[in-house]
Amino acid sequence: MRKTLLLLLLTAVFCGAFARKTPQVAPAPQVPDSLRGFYLFTEGIKQAFIERETAAARASMERSIQADSTYGPAWYELAELLLYNDAPAALRHAEHAFRTDTTDKWYLLQLGQAQILNDRYRDAIRTYNRLREVDAQNPDSYRVLAMLYDQEG
């Protein structure tokens, strides 16, 4: 009888120790309010470049801008997504991106491209002149500026 009780007790302990437990479900990540725009921006980047979902990326960028209207990278990427599909909207977003950081040469370059696509050559000449001053080592600025002067006559 003792042997049976001991065997039963050991079996219960063994089964209890190695029994399969239900996995814990991880809660959704909590994002601080100060990082909400950045979080939505990174979600948009993931959707655009990993999942190739440009519509979802655009929606994430727009939500990022709603969360933080001074977050320049979201304006920049939104303009980049729209540059060849909706040039007027891309120009508005590129102007916003440039206003958030007037020292960023990538924002300035995108603004110049958007101005060219919207046939605003005089504005593009001013933009590329400034870009030439900011990034004097970039030969493309000189080439585009020469083409713009040729276009204007």
Provide a role label for each language-model segment:
Residues 1-27:
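Bacterial Sec-dependent N-terminal signal peptides
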Residues 49-62, 82-96, 118-130, 152-153:
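Structural signature of tandem alpha-helical TPR/SEL1-like repeats
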Residues 45-46, 80, 113, 147:
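Residue-level recognition of tetratricopeptide repeat
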